[in-house]
Amino acid sequence: MGIHSSAENVALENVRQSVTYHPSVWGDYFLTPASNHEESSTSEGEELQESRQEVEKLLGATHDDSLQKLELIDAIQRLGVDHHFQKEIEKSLQDIYLRCCNDKDDYDHNQTDLHTVALRFRLLRQQGYNISSETFNKFTDRNGKFEESLADDVRGMLSLYEAAHCGVQGEKILDEALVFSSSNLKSILAKNHMSNSGLTARIEEAFDTPIRKCLTNFGARKFMSMYEEDESHSEALLKFARLDFNFSQKLHQKEISDLTRWWKELDFKTKLPFARDRMVECYCWTLGIHPEPQYNLARNFLSKVIMLASVIDDIYDVRGTLDELQLFTDAIQRWDISAMEQLPPYMRVCYEALLNVYAEVEELERIDGPYRVHYAKEEMKKLARAYLEESQWLYKKYIPTFKEYMSVAIPSSGYIMVAGNCLVGLGNSLVMKDFDWVSCEPLMVKASAIIARLMDDMAGHGFEKKISAVECYTNENGASEKEAFEELEKQVSNAWKDMNQEFLHPTAVSMTVLTRVLNAARVIHLLYKDGDSYTNSKTYIKELIEAVLIQPVKI
C-alpha cells in the first residue's frame, strides 16, 4: 500500500506551489508568415507535381524483387514524402510479402545478404505485415547466436539494428539482434576507420533516434544530407524531397501564424503568467502527429487542445489550491459556460477558452458527425479527474505504490486524451468505431501513454515538484535511483513492443488511426530523450524548430 511521507492523519495543505518557467523563446516571431503560401503555391505546385511524376516513374521502373526497390522505398519514407506514394508503396510491399509467404523456403534461401533481409523485414513490419523474425535464423550459429563474421558488415549491422526495433514481446532473436548490432556498431564508431562519412552519420543518428521512433517530417532534413552522400542516391527523388519540404514549410508557417495570433489574443501571458508559454512547441507536437498536408484542421484543433492542456496541467501543478482545483474539475465535468461563475478569475479565462475551442471545431465537424467532438470532450474530462487525484496525493504528502500511481499517471500523461482528440478533423474516412476504440483505451493507446508518462517522469525527476514513477518505485522497492531508471526504461521498451504488435495485420482500426498513436509516441521520444525539452525549450528543440519551420532547404 502507499505511504504518507509524514503522519498518517496529516491535515491537507491548501497552498499554492511555486515554480517558474522560462518565457517563450519565440514571442511574436511567427505572427507574420515569412512567405505567402497562396501566392507561391501555383507555380511551385506545378514544379512539385512534375518532380513527383519523375519519382513515380522511378518507382514503377524498379523491380519489386530487388534491393534497389527496398532502398528506394526506405529513402522515400525517410525523406518524408511517402504520403505522395502510398498506393505504390503498399502494392510493392504487399507483393513482396506475398512472395515471402507463398515461396518462403526458396525466397529465404536466395536472400543471404543481411542488409537486404533486415531492410525487407523492417519495411514489411512498418507496413503492418507480420513477417516472421525467424528469417534471421540463417545468420545464427547452432547455439542461436549471431555469427561473429557479420560484425564486419557495417551496412548489415545498421539494418539489423533498425529492424530489431520493430520487434514484439517474446521475439528473443530480435532482442539478441539489438544487443549484437548495438555492440558492434559502437565498436565500429570507436575505431573510426570508416571512409564513408554518410554511413557514420547514419549510425550516430540511429543511436540517437532509431527509424521506428523517428518522426520522418522532422528527420527528413537531416536525412537529405545523409542520402546525398550515398553514391546510389536518386537525384530525382532528392530534388522532389527538397521541393516538397519547402512547399510544406510555407503551409506550416501560415498555420503557426494563425495559431500565434489566436494565442496572442487570449493573452494568457498576462492573465496566467505562471503557465508555460509553448504555442510553437505545441504546434510542432501536432505537426509530428499529423504530418500530412491535408490535415490542417486536425493540426489547428489539436495544437490548441495541447496548449490548453499544458496550461491546465500548470493550474493543477503550480497555481491552484486544492479547493480551487476541485471547483475547476467539477466545472470541466459539467462542460457548461454557466459553471464559470463558481471559478476564481484566473481559471475562468482558461475554462472559457477551452469551451470555445471545442465549440468552434464542433461546428466544423457537424457534417462528419458531432459524436467526434463528444468523444474528445470526454477524454479531456478524464484528464482533469486524473490531474485532481494527483494533486490530492501531493497535498496529502501521499506516496502511492507504483501500481496505484500508474493507474492515475497513465491518464494524467495526457496521451489518452491526445489519442481521443487527434482523430478530430481527419475527415470522413473515420467512423464511430475508431472513436470507440480509443475510448476503450486499447493496448496501443495505453502503451503510448506509458511511454509518455515514464519518459516524462524520468526527464523531470529532480526538477518537477510532484510525485513521479521514479519516487514511487524507489519507495516501494527500496531501490536506488539507477535501478528505478533501469526498470522504467525496460517498461518503455516493452511498451514500444506492444505498439509494434498492435500495428500488425489484422488491425482493430485503420492504419490512419494507428499511425496517429504511433506518431504521438514518436513525439515523446523526440521531446524527452535528452531531458524535458518541452518545459525547457531552449534546447535542441529550438534548433529543430528553426530547421523545420524557418529555414528552407537549398534546391
UniProtKB/Swiss-Prot annotation:
Keywords: Lyase, Magnesium, Metal-binding. Pathway: Secondary metabolite biosynthesis; terpenoid biosynthesis. It holds the Pfam family Terpene_synth_C. Belongs to the terpene synthase family. Mg(2+) 3 binds at residues 456, 464. Its EC number is 4.2.3.-. A motif (DDXXD motif) lies at residues 313-317. Its cofactor is Mg(2+). Binds 3 Mg(2+) ions per subunit. It comes from Phyla dulcis (Aztec sweet herb). InterPro entries: Isoprenoid_synthase_dom_sf, Terpene_cyclase-like_1_C, Terpene_cyclase_plant_C1, Terpene_synth_N, Terpene_synth_N_sf, Terpene_synthase-like, Terpene_synthase_metal-bd, Terpenoid_cyclase/PrenylTrfase. GO terms for biological process: beta-caryophyllene biosynthetic process; diterpenoid biosynthetic process; farnesyl diphosphate catabolic process. Disulfide bonds: none annotated. One of its GO terms (molecular function) is magnesium ion binding. PANTHER family: (-)-GERMACRENE D SYNTHASE (PTHR31225:SF221), OS04G0344100 PROTEIN-RELATED (PTHR31225). Mg(2+) 2 binds at residues 313, 317. Mg(2+) 1 binds at residues 313, 317. The lineage of its organism: Eukaryota, Viridiplantae, Streptophyta, Embryophyta, Tracheophyta. The Asp-Asp-Xaa-Xaa-Asp/Glu (DDXXD/E) motif is important for the catalytic activity, presumably through binding to Mg(2+). Sesquiterpene synthase converting farnesyl diphosphate to beta-caryophyllene as the major product. It catalyses: (2E,6E)-farnesyl diphosphate = (+)-(E)-beta-caryophyllene + diphosphate. This is Beta-caryophyllene synthase.
